[in-house]
Amino acid sequence: MKVTLKHHEELGPLVRATRKCQGMRQDDTAEGIGVSENFLAKVERGGGTVQWQKLFQVLTELGLRVEIDVPDAAVALLQEQDRMRGAKR
């Protein structure tokens, strides 16, 4: 099921629910992923100061993917910027 997140605080409960559905304890999960239990707890609470690299490490290890619905106009702009960079080379 795809879930659209509107705020960073909404990600934490999804991480926690996924971990619990997999029957994993917080301390064991953190150790297995290579992050501190304190960090994983911050992720699960939706802490705003979470380090992105570690956050994606946690998400990947739990089998969660982040999908972003990008407006067509933004995709077109990025493609145009890529073409412009390619033309300058």
Q: For each of these PLM feature ranges, what is it?
A:
Residues E67-R89:
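Short, charged recognition helix plus adjacent turn
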Residues P13, G23-M24, V50:
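Residue-level signal for the short linker/turn that defines the boundary of a DNA-recognition helix
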Residues M1-K20:
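A short, Lys/Arg-rich alpha-helix, primarily the initiator
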Residues Q53-D69:
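DNA major-groove recognition helix of helix-turn-helix/homeodomain DNA-binding modules
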Residues A17, C21, E61-L64:
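Conserved amphipathic alpha-helical interaction elements at protein-protein interfaces in regulatory
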Residues M24-A41:
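Short alpha-helical DNA-recognition segment
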